[in-house]
Amino acid sequence: MHKPDEAAKPTKQQEIWQDLELGLFCHFGINTFNDKEWGDGTDDPDTFHPTSMDCLQWARTAKKAGFKYLILTAKHHDGFCLWPTKTTDYSVKSVTWRNGKGDVVRECAEACRQEGIHFGIYLSPWDRHEPCYENKADYDQFYLEQLKELLTGYGPLIELWFDGAGSEGRQYDWKKICDTVTGYQPDAMIFNMGRPTIRWVGNEDGLAPETCRNTASEARASMFTEDMLTWLPDTPKWVPAECDVPIRKKHWFWHLDDEGSLLSLEELMDIYYKSVGRGTNLLLNVSPDRNGLFPEADAERLLEFGDEIRKRFSKPIKTVEGPGKSLELMLEEPAYMDHAIIMEEISEGERIKEYKLEAGQSGKWIELARGTSVGHKKINHFDRIMASRVRFTVLSCENQPLIRSFSVYHTGVEL
């Protein structure tokens, strides 16, 4: 257990995960072919029949857009498995597609490796197909067997995504589940349940609160309850947040005639500012269609999103770093600027509680922005100003602040 005065610090694996910042969620499965969000486990497995599935298209699109990891729904609530599991016949081995020899999880994992992005797995605890679900002991063993197959056959894995939806009030053997993950994939993040190393932000809008610290002792279980999860006693204090949101409003799986719900570039950038820009990772869902491909409109929007992030933030005017409660950035000539990005050196913990940004102009300091938590990253937008000096001042902190980087930008974007 941690002492009350012991500062929380991330593990090296958590630091690596937080530096990834952008992840792609892929909801794909039997729901895709039955126009459903939540299947009840009774759909004919043979309805799963992607005509031209290409996981390389998924991984290449993700990489080109600047996303660093991809998480696939290996099994959603309907219980249909996208790998040829030995635990149930309700899987790709029981379909005519590829004569029962297909393995979506393997193809996706290999595509991610080929493209140089990390691969993670979503495995729903709730299973609406499996008959033994009603028997807690039997289902716990069933679930562990599925988990072991994925952990031992498809790694390395960056993250195991455990969904609380449908499991409100249900107790699983989270100690065994988490021990199994750390035993076979010690570098993988555990999402939100049991003994998590990362937590859910608490909504499906991709939005973190203005003050979003990396330390937490609880998190919301699902969209369908306000109850908070009880984590295992040995859960770390450092549990950074992940924000998830679908690129098509309110729909995680692909649906016919749904292109009108595609988020605009402006909406996606607002989400970026309020997720990555508030120190969390963003997990954006893009769903393959019945061909087994990202729809053209979705892929194009994703690439536009990546291009816009690079356009705004790939070339800082200047960057400085260092310890202390005040950092000043000095330019040789005055320049227009409208954004500042601050990053703490989180390997030593999160120390800043409140700060302000000021620009030096005509011998005076003009306040540009104020904020609270910084953590991994904080994006600050302010009205365009021309200045040659910018000052970052910590107003409240624990221990001496350590600034990994303090950068200013001119994007030309009015927000």
Segments from the language model and where they lie:
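Extracellular Ig-like/FN3 beta-sandwich strand-entry sites
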Residues: 387-389
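Mature catalytic domains of secreted/periplasmic carbohydrate-active enzymes
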Residues: 1-384, 393-415
